[in-house]
């Protein structure tokens, strides 16, 4: 898309009086800072009359099923809420325009007004917990929403006809410099055996991209008089739910149970390959997945990267992965080691420089809503939200009663 112009996502209110424009739907967390959420809102001043236009950014953690919300009590906690008054522009909310905002205001005209939000790095990334087959309503997890609406003040009830809601996501990508190869070893002494059993395991690298096979090297030195009957290899996802207190959930996402045996006074060495796929884990309720946008599929949640000492500050869901290697020993119990690793998407390649479109060339894209091939080549595309099985789409959500965003609701 980069060679056809700058893609800009748009979404209008049901009555068409407010339209929000965003340059992207995923905002990257660089550990120390997060990409700013910058966009513009196009308003109809004649429709607004004496009312104002507000834009709100909310990071929320839904930790219970939506159908269990009763008596005004919801299983949801707002982790972050920020408001700006976009129209008329409030002096305290004025910030320098980004390049995207300058271009959009130039293109859309005098009734386009900017808004910018800074996402604190300590906020969690967008994560969805996979619903069970019988679950209905919005899935549990962490999501981010930009909402624009017109009202006389922030306390006023928000009506769906003159409001716009867009779900965005906060994402992280794999670091460019991987850590050392994960290795682990353990030695176990058994009763009635003078010498020990030694297990050593390692991975071929520390960072794996989604869909890549994980190579596990296993080396066993069995100097005991016992037999290793079986070797079990598993990839486990750990999700730390940090809210009122911290609870950890673990879920195997790939497993291999090999009938390899290691006789007494012998050694064994073998390489195993496992590839964790969401497709093989569709029925596991509570499995952490990457936050979604639009109606495309997602994947297992990426590992969470944090600054040193930041784990005590973060609320939400922290995801990590480990490979577990377990030896089943006859009449002796199990011997096991764990190898932590990172599972993420690679950092996308930088978009190529903007190219002016020749006069005789017209960009063609089936998903385009508007396009302009003149001085500022901006392509407008409908902002469509992704959803998981069991989640309601935008139309159904807009039929819900929408409360007013307040900072003291946190």
Curated annotation (Swiss-Prot):
Residues given in the record as 1D-myo-inositol hexakisphosphate binding sites: 250, 255, 324, 326
Region annotation (Interaction with TRAF6) ranges: 318-410
Residue span of region Interaction with SRC: 1-163
Region Interaction with CHRM2: start-end pairs: 45-86
PROSITE patterns: ARRESTINS
Location relative to the cell: Cytoplasm; Nucleus; Cell membrane; Membrane, Clathrin-coated pit
Chain positions covered by the region annotation Disordered: 345-367, 389-410
GO cellular component, one term: cytoplasmic vesicle
Modified positions (Phosphoserine) in chain numbering: 404
Recorded GO MF terms: G protein-coupled receptor binding
Keywords per UniProt: Cell membrane, Cell projection, Coated pit, Cytoplasm, Cytoplasmic vesicle, Membrane, Nucleus, Phosphoprotein, Protein transport, Signal transduction inhibitor, Transcription, Transcription regulation, Transport, Ubl conjugation
Domain notes: The [DE]-X(1,2)-F-X-X-[FL]-X-X-X-R motif mediates interaction the AP-2 complex subunit AP2B1. Binding to phosphorylated GPCRs induces a conformationanl change that exposes the motif to the surface.
PANTHER family: ARRESTIN, BETA-ARRESTIN-1
Protein family per UniProt: Belongs to the arrestin family.
Functional description taken from the UniProt entry: Functions in regulating agonist-mediated G-protein coupled receptor (GPCR) signaling by mediating both receptor desensitization and resensitization processes. During homologous desensitization, beta-arrestins bind to the GPRK-phosphorylated receptor and sterically preclude its coupling to the cognate G-protein; the binding appears to require additional receptor determinants exposed only in the active receptor conformation.
Protein name: Beta-arrestin-1
Gene this chain is encoded by: ARRB1
